[in-house]
């Protein structure tokens, strides 16, 4: 465990009123200062991040606990929310609103008071404008739905279940709320816990009780598995992708931040965003795709290494990039990778919140030819990074397990420019909003 964290987490507010039953997950809206929280009481609660109060309660669509939800991206003039339930169904909810948007469609934030949104009107109007509409029920899974995720374009919705299957649905966007099943994947050998879309590509990652992570792509109108990882030794609970254009922080001892950043971006442009995972084995791991040139060169002799994602087809090879500092003492249920700062947070059964930061290191690297004599001409510069735990908070929700964590843009009147908050969701029904002080 890190001896001297350099930052601290401070409670900003609880979201009120809370659910009286277990809450599973909180999903920040992609553009508005609101969040949706899933609860065992069969409802989804929508809260404001400007005043931390309840705006709406979505109910009546599911017969059992609502386990997961996700906002559809790139929707104009309304909010669209997908919900997944233990009743084996997926609900699509819609609501017309202009809350938090200026006339030109840009996102704005409340400034004048806790009860005003960016257009200067009371946020309570958001609740009174119009009720949520239960648009359609997607029926196909045979057991509890554990995760839902929209593709970057918003046209595809992935769902996964305890029935070991992953479904991909296409929103036909025909004005009649019609969805079409485009794929059903059943390669996992256990409960599928999480699905997460690549931030820009139509590539889907899934995590399972079978201890594996799998990658899926469409090939000639047919979705199939392109890679499978067997690096974790326990259930893989959650996945999150790195943001586009992320660059690690520069360590204080490094005087070459600019050149390192440029070299880093060049390297990442070849492999793309990385993938973070967390597990029952109490580890957080980060995976990266090997560029095609490297895959061709190392195709022979790559067996026997447990941290390699071995392709079952011909498409991709993924490998472990790093094992993060092992801070948690029990199962890790969720990770959240900030798309703005590159910070990564984890939560789990031990009640801890841990925040990690990636820092540049500088060290020489030898050329691949090991027979080359040791001299200055045989040494080439290469970027290296290390992850450190910069903040550790014990007992974030008292004695209760923390089920989920998410980053969101801070929206209350005391915010700083581009400041983010952490939102945690727990077994006691509470949702807490935290600030990171450095």
Swiss-Prot record:
Which superkingdom is the protein from?
A: Eukaryota
The residue intervals holding the WD repeats read 15-57, 61-103, 140-179, 187-226, 254-297, 327-366, 396-438
Polar residues: bias regions: 296-305
A GO BP entry = iron-sulfur cluster assembly
Q: Which UniProt keywords apply?
A: Repeat, WD repeat
Q: Note the SUPFAM superfamilies from the entry.
A: WD40 repeat-like (SSF50978)
Q: Where is this region: Disordered?
A: 290-311
- Database matches in Pfam families: WD40
Any one cellular component term from GO for this entry? cytosolic [4Fe-4S] assembly targeting complex
Tell me its family.
Belongs to the WD repeat CIA1 family.
Q: What does this protein do?
A: Essential component of the cytosolic iron-sulfur (Fe/S) protein assembly machinery. Required for the maturation of extramitochondrial Fe/S proteins.
Q: What is this protein called?
A: Probable cytosolic iron-sulfur protein assembly protein 1
Q: What is the lineage of its organism?
A: Eukaryota, Fungi, Dikarya, Ascomycota, Pezizomycotina
- State the gene name recorded for this protein: cia1
